[in-house]
Regions:
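An N-terminal-biased, well-structured beta-alpha scaffold segment characteristic
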Residues: 1-25, 30, 124, 144, ...
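Phosphate-binding beta-alpha-beta segment of Rossmann-like dinucleotide-binding domains, i.e.
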Residues: 20-22, 26-73, 88, 92, ...
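N-terminal Rossmann-fold NAD(P) dinucleotide-binding loop
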Residues: 83-84
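Surface-exposed amphipathic alpha-helices with a cationic face
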Residues: 18, 87-91, 152, 175
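Rossmann-like adenosine-cofactor binding region
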Residues: 103-185
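Glycine-rich Rossmann-fold phosphate-binding loop(s) that bind the pyrophosphate
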Residues: 79-80
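Hydrophobic beta-strand scaffold residues
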Residues: 1, 23-24, 97, 116, ...
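Short, hydrophobic beta-strand segments that form beta-sheet elements in well-ordered domains
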Residues: 2, 97-101, 183-186
Length: 186
């Protein structure tokens, strides 16, 4: 018997478990922590928190200028349960929110006042691009250097989804060459 937190766990081979007559079960998912972490990362990036904390320990106070969220564009890859919660908080900050996914629900977009868009528009327009899709082959390497090159140089990339949705090697290149302003990762 295998029990996992959440209803889906990509690290469990369900086919092999079934062949071996192993029961796999999951607990009910709690979506609240993921949007909270997403916003902790966004706020930390927008306000340069790591740099400010490091500077404070060295005796410097308020050494950077943060980014105001009001009026900025929040792009979401995925507008399911987690993405919808992130969108609501973005709207509360006065952000314009846009979303794309392969199975985007237009009724959800309308209900949340989220602009549906193409992947291309979602890559090039946001000030903050946050990923909220399930890992796996469907979205593997959804964000590579090709996409990061099209992002605003001042944009931040946030990923609290599981799996290799962002190419790690490409992200390192984009950050080291200042193709994007920063990244927040779970």
């Amino acid at each position: 018997f295998i029990i996992t937190s959440g209803l889906k766990n990509k690290s469990i081979d369900l086919v092999s478990a079934k062949k071996r007559k192993i029961i796999v079960s999951g607990t009910e998912s709690n979506i609240n922590p993921t949007p909270e972490l997403t916003w902790a990362l966004i706020l930390g990036l927008a306000r340069n928190l790591k740099e400010e904390i490091d500077n404070m320990y060295q005796g410097y106070w308020q050494s950077t200028i943060g980014v105001e969220l009001k009026g900025k564009i929040l792009g979401l890859i995925g507008l399911g349960k987690v993405g919808s919660q992130v969108a609501k908080i973005g709207k509360a900050f006065g952000m314009q929110v846009m979303a794309w996914s392969e199975n985007l629900n237009l009724d959800t977009c309308k209900e949340l006042d989220v602009l549906p868009c193409s992947k291309e528009d979602l890559i090039k327009n946001p000030d903050f691009l946050s990923i909220h899709v399930q890992g796996g082959e469907r979205y593997k390497n959804c964000i590579t250097i090709k996409e990061m090159d099209k992002m605003k140089k001042t944009a931040f990339l946030i990923n609290t989804s599981r799996g290799p949705i962002i190419s790690e090697d490409d992200l390192i290149i984009a950050l080291s060459t200042n193709e994007i302003a920063g990244a927040g990762l779970d």
